[in-house]
Amino acid sequence: MPASTYPPSVDALARRLAQQREFDRLPRTMLVDAVRSAVATAPSEAESTAVDLARLATRRLLTSVINGTGTLLHTNLGRSPRPLPTAVADRVRATTIELDLATGERGSRHGAVAELLVDLTGAEATVVVNNCAAGLVLVLAALAHGRGVVISRGELVEIGGGFRIPDIIEQSGCRLIEVGTTNRTRLADYQRAIESNDVAVVLKVHPSNYRITGFTEEVGIATLATLGLPVIGDLGTGLLDASTPWLADASGQQPNVAWIRQEPSVREWLSEGADVVIVSGDKLLGGPQSGLVLGRTAIVATCAGHPLMRPLRAGTLVMEALQETLVAYGRNDARSLPFWEQATRSIAELRGRATELVDAIAKDQVRAAECSSTPGGGTMPNTQIASYGVRISGSYVDALRGWSVPIIARGHDGATWIDLRTVDPADDEVVLAAIRAINFGL
């Protein structure tokens, strides 16, 4: 058989690919898989096919991108942007996740985080799990296993990924008791359900990813608290306090974030009588993915002692990142957090950055333009935040996404938009280089 008819050596080809810088992040096993697939499907073009497959494999790895969509809490991009915890970035040492340095004895992983959350929200106690849905499962299992959970039909929400509140209630070992109708639920509906069923708790779910308007009626936390049963509030969105005292500057001046003032907060629901409130850490809090369970000491203690607490608890990296987030709040310096920095950027600043980029490109197809950002992350539907960005005539979303540092842009109205509200100013040069190279070859 002529030598040219033999398939190339998988090992040799994998070694050649490993020498290419663009594949530095790929482990050898993935390079070998790419080469084997290429040899099996296109032996005569094995090397070029293997390169293509290796590039696809590289793209499947988690990597940092530039969010130019204008969605502050983009679920597909990890929701609230955040740097690595200082403790992780600065050293490779052990951490006092469950050690009390004062006594040398075993401590609680919630220590300082719990103290900070109590100060910031008015809660009596708190525990942290790995996300909001986990928090709801834990609370329901601890307080209502085998018994009824009463909830308005207008609050039987579905969150991302097809997960539904009724299914979560069922998996918690509880019995769902629906009351009212989709658009109108009254106190009497809850009362009748409690009188005729074995009800353990009342569940109030904030419909954060949709709105029901028009001929509507709902029962607030304060009224539900008169029913004589524990009230669980699934707030989800994670706003600690609608007055945002931690955003004020040294003179007490608040930034223009009027769009958030009508959003219910943890402090509000607790003060109105909720026994426990559950929120996400990576939404309007601006921290890592986590679920915060805040409320009365006895209830939180019951949750902390439940067998599900162990498998659902947050890990060390999450607790460190959450602690740093809350310390910024405690210092009234929440604007230093990436999410709040983006949310509070002024139109003047954004317009100036857009103008500088457009002037540097100097092409008729590219101009600075007004646009609208959105909170995202299943929060505040229909809320628009005035913004500014770069508008490129034509469709270049795919090209920008394929840049060395992927830029996630938005296609709309025959143009490609890069909303600068969600782009770090330090990345403006990357955006400039990408637009020049991909579109105009400058």
Task: Give the positions of each predicted feature.
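Long amphipathic alpha-helical segments
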Residues: M1-L61, V65
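Conserved C-terminal alpha-helix-loop-beta "cap" of PLP-dependent enzymes
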Residues: R351-V430
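Short Gly/Ser/Thr- and Asp/Glu-enriched loop/turn motifs at secondary-structure junctions
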Residues: P8, I66-G70, L285-P288, I385, ...
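Glycine-rich phosphate-binding segment of PLP-dependent enzymes
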Residues: V35-R36, A40, G68-T69, R79-T103
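Conserved PLP-dependent catalytic core of the aminotransferase class-I/II
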Residues: I151, V318-M319, Q323-G376
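A short linear hydrophobic-aromatic micro-motif
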Residues: L61-L62, V279, V405-R410
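Long amphipathic N-terminal alpha/beta scaffold segment
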Residues: S44-R82, A87-A89, E115
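Conserved PLP-enzyme active-site core in the AAT-like
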Residues: G104-T316, E320-V327, A434
